UniProtKB/Swiss-Prot annotation:
Species assigned in the record: Drosophila melanogaster (Fruit fly)
Coiled coil: none
Residue ranges, annotated region (Disordered): 1-65
Chain residues that bind Ca(2+): D88, D90, D92, D99
Alphabetical list of PANTHER family matching this protein: MYOSIN REGULATORY LIGHT CHAIN 2
Positions carrying N-acetylalanine: A2
Keyword Repeat: yes
Biased composition (Low complexity): 19-53
Name assigned to this protein: Myosin regulatory light chain 2
Length: 222
């Protein structure tokens, strides 16, 4: 009987020991911090794709700008740059409706809001210098202009509808914008222009004088 009691006591002691060890292990596990969750690879891939897409968009935009500049010669780009600076009346690097209106006013033309909106609507965004070159390039492609003189003529006629330019406005523009002319230089230039009794300059004759085409034709005829 005494032996049986001893066995029971030993059994209980073992069970209590086992329970104690189990509780200790559980407490240890609870005290150990859980490992940080690993980010899902799918989310990372999506972010990478977005970043890659943005980079591609940026490269595409740069390529588009570069291709426009390759259409024109350095001389043409310099001329367009000067024209852009003349048109950018508020000097913010962007040509808006008020800038276009001022450009038309400077050559004696009146453009209504509908016409100005139509011109601005041709651009895919704000008209900065690159966008202006793009518009001119598209206009040149449509008109079939290919050499330097034809590009200059087509660009000049963009702001001319009836073949005449107001002499006073043109004089003011020459003396106040771009490479500013002195009064004597303007007077000398006007002496060579075809100007009617209403002080209107013949655009075609002016273009011939600027490009030298009239002189070339006279030499060929001789």
């Amino acid at each position: 009987m005494a032996d049986e009691k001893k066995k029971v006591k030993k059994k209980k002691t073992k069970e209590e020991g086992g329970t104690s060890e189990t509780a200790s292990e559980a407490a240890s596990e609870a005290a150990t911090p859980a490992p940080a969750a690993t980010p899902a690879p799918a989310a990372s891939a999506t972010g990478s794709k977005r970043a890659s897409g943005g980079s591609r968009g940026s490269r595409k935009s740069k390529r588009a700008g570069s291709s426009v500049f390759s259409v024109f010669s350095q001389k043409q780009i310099a001329e367009f740059k000067e024209a852009f600076q003349l048109m950018d009346a508020d000097k913010d690097g962007i040509i808006g409706k008020n800038d276009l209106r001022a450009a038309f006013d400077s050559v004696g033309k009146i453009a209504n809001d509908k016409e100005l909106d139509a011109m601005l609507g041709e651009a895919s965004g704000p008209i900065n210098f690159t966008q202006l070159l793009t518009l001119f390039a598209n206009r040149m492609a449509t008109s079939g202009a290919n050499d330097e003189d034809e590009v200059v003529i087509a660009a000049f006629k963009t702001f001319d509808n009836d073949g005449l330019i107001d002499g006073d406005k043109f004089r003011e523009m020459l003396m106040n914008f771009g490479d500013k002319f002195t009064m004597k230089e303007v007077d000398d230039a006007y002496d060579q222009m075809v100007i009617d009794d209403k002080n209107q300059i013949d655009t075609a004759a002016l273009i011939e004088m600027l490009t030298g085409k009239g002189e070339e034709e006279e030499e060929e005829a001789a």
